[in-house]
């Protein structure tokens, strides 16, 4: 799939413009300390952020953080972007980095008008809009509520999507904004992701070897079908391997599998059977939490145990298939990666892919998630050609479907237009203004700032200060 989307460098006359930027700051946070444990996603967004700030825009940044399902999720502060605000301030020294606790504050237009050129305003977690003041799950963000997308779009002149990790979702903070704004573009990160992933699937260097792992085959079927069209080999591991083995008549003991996917799995074997390579042995145990497992050939698989990793014979077989590969696409671990007793297959295959990438120039792509975590654990992250920042997004990309968060962006040369959106009786901002700040910890009126806000002249009256976000 080829892309001709506007990128941030195609935008002109940016000085003084208001730009709303969707980032993916869904970072891991230590539950005890409340500190961020991996800054990769924040650092990945800095190129676009710095580019826009250096152009003199007023930058409004949106992101989600985890899922928000209850008022407790909001009031506890555990899913607040305040910790991200702190990280951004530390990385954007010398630049004004503000934070607004209410991402639907009716005074946001005034706050943004009062911002200095080249400053940034981070709005609170977009998914706070998924729960209303009564604690009801309304999913205004996650289900792309028209009024919410229109409100956020009204805050800016231009929309930039640089959140690849959420581009497979049609949310109010990406598709909803893009439909209601005249000019839009993708950021450096999304552009890089599209280019790197495309290289693996559009006229890739042959032979192509794809590796699929993880627990559920249902998550991978569309990608297997699409990649199966051009891949030379498809290596199957992880929990999903057992449904393939069962479909071929092997004993899999108490290994979990999706019974409703059995017929579909048989169809995959029928269509791509000459390409699919399955485990020939497995490491089994009586529990996923077992301290150690025992290896069995598939022909001798015990009926009273379950498989949690590929065995040494399978690792050797997979390495043999990978040896001649010029392109490798990997999505999903080959075992229960979280347990050291069952991570050998994932780690050894990971190191081998890194080795052939470094030694013979194989083009290797990891589709994020646990596979990326495996590369980090092995210390070979920089040995891969590309490690995606979006597990779900990369998987959908591999299925051949255009991502909603990319499809909504204007193409190069396309004239700006705004799609008509039917108004609701109660607007999103009106709803937000009714929320109790004591429960949701959002500002029902503009937050105060330690910095002086710009003054708006008024006829025959003293100048009134504009609302300002917290610094």
Curated annotation (Swiss-Prot):
Q: Does the keyword ATP-binding apply?
A: yes
Keywords in UniProt for this one? ATP-binding, Cytoplasm, Glycolysis, Kinase, Nucleotide-binding, Transferase
GO annotation, cellular component aspect: cytosol
List, alphabetically, the SUPFAM superfamilies matched: Phosphoglycerate kinase
Q: Which InterPro entries match?
A: Phosphoglycerate_kinase, Phosphoglycerate_kinase_CS, Phosphoglycerate_kinase_N, Phosphoglycerate_kinase_sf
Any one of the GO BP annotations: glycolytic process
Residues the entry annotates as binding substrate: 24-26, 41, 64-67, 127, 169
UniProt-recorded Gene Ontology molecular function terms? ADP binding; ATP binding; phosphoglycerate kinase activity
- The residues the record assigns to binding ATP are 220, 307, 338, 368-371
> Compositionally biased, Low complexity: which spans?
439-455
UniProt pathway: Carbohydrate degradation; glycolysis; pyruvate from D-glyceraldehyde 3-phosphate: step 2/5
Q: Which family does it belong to?
A: Belongs to the phosphoglycerate kinase family.
Complex and partners = Monomer.
Q: What is this protein called?
A: Phosphoglycerate kinase
